[in-house]
Structures are given as C-alpha cells and as structure tokens.
C-alpha cells in the first residue's frame, strides 16, 4: 500500500513527463489495515492525466455483480465510453440499483468485513511463521499474502522437482489440494499469492496442508 509521501514522490516524477498517463487501480481502497487509502488522483497537477479504475467487487463484496467504473478527465472518459459501449450493452438495471444502494449506504458492513479480514490476516501470519522456508511481509491491505518461496526451488518429494514458483503452485494444487497463484503473474517470480478471503476453518486446513506438502520437499 502506497503512503501519501510515496505517491507524492511518484507524482513529482510524473510532473516532469507530461506525456505520461497514469492508470490507478484502486479496487481495494476500503480494505486497508494500516491508515487511510491514498490516491494519486489527489494531486491537482496530475488529475487530468489520472485514470482511476474502481468497482464494487472488493469493498462491497459484490464480485458476482460485475460492475466497475473509471474516474477520468471527460475527454478520456468519452473515449473509453466509445470502446466499452461496443463491448457490452450496459449493466443490468438491478445491478445499477444495487450499486446505488452500496455507494450511498453506510459503510458499517464494509467496516465489519475489514475487521474480520484483520483477524484472518493475523492468524495467517502466525501460520506462515510456523512453516519453515516461507518468508512473508505482513500485508497492509487487500486479502492476500505474498510469501517468498524460492527456498524450495531445486527441492523434490521423490516424484516432483520444484524449479520455480509456477511448479510449486502446481505441486500444492496436486499434492495438497490448495490453490495458489504464482508470483510470476505479478512480476515477482520468487513468490506465490495466497488468499485469505475464506473462512477461518478453511484457512487453518489450507495452511496445514501447505505445511505438510512443503515438509515433504528436500
């Protein structure tokens, strides 16, 4: 999660390059564990070049409703509308009504959700600390952990040899029946992503299986 100071430093770099436009995906703006959400769109000298992408999937737990939006300068928004209008015929009326209710309603359900995610984050970090070889920073937002797993590269369980994060993810899926995502999808090939958007019971079971599967690698 970027701090305001970090965003300001980036903004000052972009100030020197007026040809650059900034696309900022802020879908997790309400799922913060440390401080308030900060947007790069807050800097007036950049606001005409920022395309802010958001939606209702994360902060309002409306993943299945499939409704997102952008906030941008009118010229950019109109150009996007020309393309988007040819891709879909429009959001359904019931989805639009639900979105209005979410965006104009109180934030207590979201606050309760973040409180629960905070508890899960704490437990997940405890579970990771008990798995030899996993190294993980505590996430400041969203509902994922991103542990380093490169200590397992080159190891095998007798049948499978792990050479990268992609293979480790397949190993965990096939041997532990736990689904993870390779860090190479996010530009970090030494990590894997694990979601804790699940029940505490399933989190406990999942990490127990991960621990057992990784312990078989030598």
Segment roles from a protein language model:
Residues 1-218:
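PLP-dependent class I/II
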């Amino acid at each position: 999660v970027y701090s305001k100071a970090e965003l300001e430093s980036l903004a000052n770099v972009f100030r020197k390059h007026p040809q650059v436009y900034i696309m900022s995906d802020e879908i997790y703006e309400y799922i913060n564990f440390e401080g308030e959400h900060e947007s790069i769109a807050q800097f007036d000298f950049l606001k005409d070049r920022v395309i802010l992408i958001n939606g209702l999937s994360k902060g309002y737990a409306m993943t299945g409703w499939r409704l997102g939006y952008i906030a941008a300068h009118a010229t950019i928004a109109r150009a996007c509308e020309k393309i988007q209008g040819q891709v879909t015929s429009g959001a359904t009326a019931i989805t639009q009504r639900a979105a209005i209710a979410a965006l104009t309603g109180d934030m207590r359900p979201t606050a309760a959700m973040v409180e629960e995610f905070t508890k899960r984050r704490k437990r997940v970090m405890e579970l990771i600390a008990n798995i030899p070889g996993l190294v993980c920073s505590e996430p400041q937002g969203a509902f994922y952990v991103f542990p380093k797993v490169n200590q397992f590269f080159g190891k095998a369980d007798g049948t499978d040899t792990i050479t990268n994060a992609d293979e480790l993810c397949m190993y965990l899926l096939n041997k532990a029946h736990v689904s993870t995502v390779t860090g190479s999808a996010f530009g970090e090939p030494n990590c894997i992503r694990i979601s804790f958007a699940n029940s505490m019971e399933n989190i406990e079971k999942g990490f127990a299986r991960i621990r057992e599967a990784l312990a078989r690698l030598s």
